[in-house]
Amino acid sequence: KYSNRHMTIGRVAHITEGTKPGLGRSNCQFRNRCRRGCPFGAYFSSNSSTLPAAEATGNMTLRTNSIVYEVIYDELNKRATGVKIIDSESNLTYEFKAKIIFMCASTVPTTSILMQSKSNRFPNGLGNDSGELGHNIMDHHFQIGADATYDGFEDKYYTGRRPNGIYIPRFQNIGGKTKNTNFLRGYGYQGGASRTDWTKYVKEASYGEKLKQAVIRPGEWTMGLNGFGEVLPYHDNKIFLDYNKTDKWGLPTVTFDAKLRENELNMRKDMQLQAMEMLDNAGFKNV
């Protein structure tokens, strides 16, 4: 029925064979420590990958408790030459100079730093000649889809802690007959299947021996599809600095002014509709 829809294993930023000797990274150990930053270094994070590699060179100095709030711009040489920081413990300010500066503070803090980096050349923030800095916020909109139960496979179970579920790549608005007139762009699904467990009985609908027997047996199979859709770049979806509301270090706080608009709301309707339809056509119940 769905010639243009493909369910595959999800992809993660994992290495498959480890790294050079001495860097201390290995492939996934299936230990369910992903949310701790992966102590095995199997997936990329600065804590387990680039920082240890930089430290191993002997040329890295790591300064903690340092809040970067401005990039220093040299108007004579027309280049960034360093950063200004506040020590979060002493409240003292320092300047650090460098030939090359990498802004790696993630999306919102990096934008905030650039907006605070004002000079005669960049009165509205470093690199903000267009006035677009802080505008066009884009992220996934999600938490919509469908789930269902399945009768059968009662003699089957699963083992291990695979760090990912299934994925259905985007299939709307990719050419040909996939064009949807209700919205632009598209979405994909993340999902997975599992069997219910003892948490199903936390409402205490039963008790005694009946409850004991119920909680030690795997429950029914369930499957969920969770949509992750694109947000269009709207100029009015923005963040800005509030200099009237500062944090404990006297820096302006970041205020968000953004919302989902008609295109995203129409897409969400389709995300739910298609998920329900696929599960129903696959023989699931209680969709």
Locate predicted features.
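Structural recognition of the beta-strand scaffold that forms the well-ordered cores
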Residues: 9, 103-104, 240
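Conserved redox-cofactor binding core of oxidoreductases
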Residues: 1-68
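Generic, well-ordered alpha-helical scaffold segments in large soluble proteins
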Residues: 2, 53, 57, 104, ...
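A glycine-rich dinucleotide-binding beta-alpha-beta segment and adjacent secondary-structure elements
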Residues: 8-10, 31, 69-72, 82, ...
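FAD cofactor-binding and catalytic pocket of flavoenzymes
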Residues: 130-255, 262
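Glycine-rich loop(s) and the adjacent beta-strand/alpha-helix scaffold that form part
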Residues: 40, 56-57, 66, 70-77, ...
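Generic recognition of stable, solvent-exposed alpha-helical segments in well-folded globular domains
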Residues: 29, 33, 45-49, 63, ...
